[in-house]
Amino acid sequence: MADTLNHLPEPQKGEDLYRYLLERVTNLEDRNTELREQLRQIEADKRYLETQKVRYEREVRKFKGEIEQMKSPPLVIGTVTDLIDENRVIVRSSAGPRFLVGISQSLNIEEIKPGARCTLNQQSLAIVEILPTNYDAQIYGMEVIEAPSERYEEIGGLEKQINEIREAVELPLKKPEVFRKMGIEPPKGVLLHGPPGTGKTLLARAVAHQTEAHFLRVVGSELVQKYIGEGARLVRELFELAKKKSPSIIFIDEIDAIGASRTESNTSGDREVHRTLMQLLAEMDGFSNRGDVRIIGATNRIDILDRALLRPGRFDRIIEIPAPDIEGRVSILNIHCAGMNIDKKVDIRDIATRTDGKNGADLRSICMEAGMFAIRSDHEMVTLEDFEQSIEKFSNDFERDSLINTSGAMFA
């Protein structure tokens, strides 16, 4: 374009000179606009390249750090056994021998306590880092991460029991100031007992849904271990984790598996169960305070539980979960039939009258079987006839009462 401007013909007259100058100015303005646009594009490219440079430099530093970490020698795992002074401690390495070692200046001396796990430098064996407390994998498996979906409204016929468990477990966690105002200690343990299928575990699941406390669930048989001391260690770590994450609730289902009365048994298995029970008694109400940890126990056999387990201070409230009466059965049937397509001729109270002696689990099965009969008969909705067939089938399929009442020997 510059050559074009330089080779424009020379103007001969005034009018030609005007047009010549106007055209030259226009060309210069266009050239200026073009150069400005190129400048903006170059500056944008420069900013993009600078951003890319910073990103690549960051990635290079990251990869260099990973390479250095891979090149660094591994650290030795040890356990602090004794504190000599602010600069020296006695540790036991993972190999077994004990050493008197120094402490890294970057560590907080208050974190170094006997029993703490630490990492040691391979050359000097100086303490480099304090590791978090390690719990058995089974203990982490007892944590309830996702709250159950059951609610108190879905439990029928247990209004009194629900109020008692909410007062003993939920109220101290949500309104502790009420107990401080009255000058009393809130209940720390609740034992639910009653026949199978009456809703003990369902109540505990509703508590887990309702409270915002950390919830840990364990079956009593999980605490029975093969080797000496393993069951007691699990109990100790379970309560340590509960205290660490307090406020928390520990639910021990089928507690009679480890809580049966102690007898003069000569078998090693029974003695190990007794050791586990004694550790549980000490953790529930022993020398040290267990903190803001609530305990819910559930059992079908309260008659065989050890007396030391039932005393106040361990289980302050013992709540019986009985088989539902007529009103309770009506409430339970209404809950289970709420989502079913039922004929209007079906009288829930009449069905409740016909199911005398049945518990909540039985009533749920009766509703499910009635729905299955309706599907089998290709009905549009569940009819009274379907419920009658379900009740008859449930009574005749298995001689449940005769099986329950039949006495027999128990084999280990």
From Swiss-Prot:
GO biological process: proteasomal protein catabolic process; protein unfolding
Coiled-coil spans in chain: 15-72
Signal sequence extent: none
Keywords for this protein: ATP-binding, Chaperone, Coiled coil, Cytoplasm, Nucleotide-binding, Proteasome
Localization, UniProt: Cytoplasm
Entry keyword annotation includes Nucleotide-binding: yes
One GO molecular-function entry: ATP binding
GO cellular component: a single term: proteasome-activating nucleotidase complex
Residues at which ATP binds: 197-202, 336
Pfam families: AAA, AAA_lid_3, Prot_ATP_ID_OB_C
InterPro entries: 26S_Proteasome_ATPase, AAA+_ATPase, AAA_lid_3, ATPase_AAA_core, ATPase_AAA_CS, NA-bd_OB-fold, Nucleotidase_PAN, P-loop_NTPase
Region (Docks into pockets in the proteasome alpha-ring to cause gate opening): 410-412
PROSITE patterns, per database record: AAA
Family: Belongs to the AAA ATPase family.
NCBIfam families listed in its UniProt record: PRK03992.1 (NF003069), proteasome-activating nucleotidase (TIGR01242)
UniProt domain comment: Consists of three main regions, an N-terminal coiled-coil domain that may assist in substrate recognition, an interdomain involved in PAN hexamerization, and a C-terminal ATPase domain of the AAA type.
Assembly notes: Homohexamer. The hexameric complex has a two-ring architecture resembling a top hat that caps the 20S proteasome core at one or both ends. Upon ATP-binding, the C-terminus of PAN interacts with the alpha-rings of the proteasome core by binding to the intersubunit pockets.
Function: ATPase which is responsible for recognizing, binding, unfolding and translocation of substrate proteins into the archaeal 20S proteasome core particle. Is essential for opening the gate of the 20S proteasome via an interaction with its C-terminus, thereby allowing substrate entry and access to the site of proteolysis. Thus, the C-termini of the proteasomal ATPase function like a 'key in a lock' to induce gate opening and therefore regulate proteolysis.
Protein name from the UniProt record: Proteasome-activating nucleotidase
Organism: Methanosphaerula palustris (strain ATCC BAA-1556 / DSM 19958 / E1-9c)
Chain's gene name: pan
